């Protein structure tokens, strides 16, 4: 399968997910949040474009995964997964991926506000300029530096005094206007001054910074940013539930196909998770759904006109299986 076919396949998967939720919500989402996150895919052979990554301390690929969240729903729906070389910067491919998602989402949800959440590896002037030109909200992590450390110094002092007085972890918030030397203009930086205290340990300073164009209070902005942490659970499901890291083919494009097949399977499982509300599998992760609903002994009967699957008449999760089968369109 060549590059064009793989690109088309990736676009179709994203379009399918977005169209599915357009029908579910009737195009009435108020806000759609896009999360991007890279993840390491360790390699153990001579695959094309596998490189050593110092951050993860291993030879790997570095795929990037995108999810969308509608309004205040807890679910993050996977829409895109792109395989990248192991030494790729976090932001490689991000602008093209976001550009297409913006176009597709706006066509499906014309009145929705788009919001992007990213970690500090993506922070750069080209990214901020792109997001501002696209007219979207953004909350992006920002690595600390000498200048930002000076801006947060007073807050950190106050947090240390509070932590000492209470004997517990202390957090204080503030904001400032800041521009790095490579930035075209100043932007709002939300600061969190945190002093972490654990019994028997020396208190630890934990300053954090977030770049945003939102007008919300600093605590509210930082709370929005922290919600992206649930993305780690999506990555764990892809890795441990569906083995997205089985990219052992020697050719890079073949491994991209494997990643897309894993994404397609995950999209199906996420739909099962959504349809499982009201059952014992309502909060089940992919691994549990596989064990309870997919790993069944089936007798296959084939005739000239049809193929019949004879399922077991009794097994522990029969009622849940029937509920989900009917929810996705099966008839008895």
Where are the model-predicted features located?
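Active-site-proximal, Lys/Arg-enriched surface segment
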Residues: 1-69
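An anionic, glycine-rich sequence signature occurring as long contiguous blocks
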Residues: 137-240, 323, 327-332
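Short acidic, glycine/serine/threonine-rich loops at helix termini
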Residues: 43-50, 78-80, 125-131, 150-155
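A short, flexible helix-boundary coil/loop motif
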Residues: 265-332
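Short amphipathic alpha-helical "interface-anchor" segments enriched in bulky aromatics
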Residues: 218-257, 261, 265-272
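Domain-level cores of phosphate- or acyl-group-handling catalytic modules
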Residues: 88-147
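Electropositive, glycine- and tryptophan-enriched low-complexity nucleic-acid-binding patches
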Residues: 54-109
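Short, conserved catalytic/metal-binding motifs centered on acidic residues
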Residues: 1, 32-40, 76, 114-123, ...
């Amino acid at each position: 399968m060549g590059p064009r076919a793989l690109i088309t396949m990736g676009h179709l998967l994203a379009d399918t997910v977005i169209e599915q939720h357009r029908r579910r919500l009737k195009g009435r989402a108020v806000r759609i949040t896009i999360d991007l996150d890279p993840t390491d895919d360790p390699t153990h052979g001579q695959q094309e474009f596998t490189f050593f990554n110092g951050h993860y301390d291993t030879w790997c690929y570095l795929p990037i995964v995108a999810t969308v969240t509608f309004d205040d729903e807890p679910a993050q729906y996977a829409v895109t997964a792109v395989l990248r070389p192991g030494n790729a910067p976090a932001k490689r491919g991000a602008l093209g991926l976001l550009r297409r998602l913006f176009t597709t989402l706006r066509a499906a949800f014309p009145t929705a506000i788009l919001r992007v959440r990213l970690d500090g590896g993506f922070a750069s002037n080209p990214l901020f300029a792109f997001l501002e030109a696209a007219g979207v909200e953004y909350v992006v992590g920002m690595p600390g530096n000498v200048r930002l450390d000076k801006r947060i110094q007073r807050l950190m002092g106050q947090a240390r005094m509070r932590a000492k007085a209470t004997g517990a972890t202390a957090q204080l918030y503030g904001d400032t206007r800041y521009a790095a030397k490579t930035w075209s203009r100043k932007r709002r930086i939300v600061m969190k001054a945190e002093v972490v205290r654990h019994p028997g340990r020396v208190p630890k300073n934990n300053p954090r910074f977030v770049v945003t164009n939102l007008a919300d209070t600093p605590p509210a902005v930082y709370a929005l940013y922290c919600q992206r942490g649930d993305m780690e659970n999506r990555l764990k499901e892809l890795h441990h539930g569906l083995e997205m890291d089985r990219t052992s083919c020697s050719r890079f494009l073949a491994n991209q196909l494997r990643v897309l097949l894993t994404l397609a399977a995950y999209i199906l499982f996420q739909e099962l998770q959504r349809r499982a509300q009201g059952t014992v599998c309502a909060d089940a992760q992919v691994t549990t759904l596989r064990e309870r609903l997919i790993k069944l002994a089936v007798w296959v009967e084939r005739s000239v006109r049809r193929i019949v699957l004879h399922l077991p008449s009794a097994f522990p999760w029969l009622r849940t299986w029937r509920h989900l089968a009917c929810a996705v369109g099966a008839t008895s």
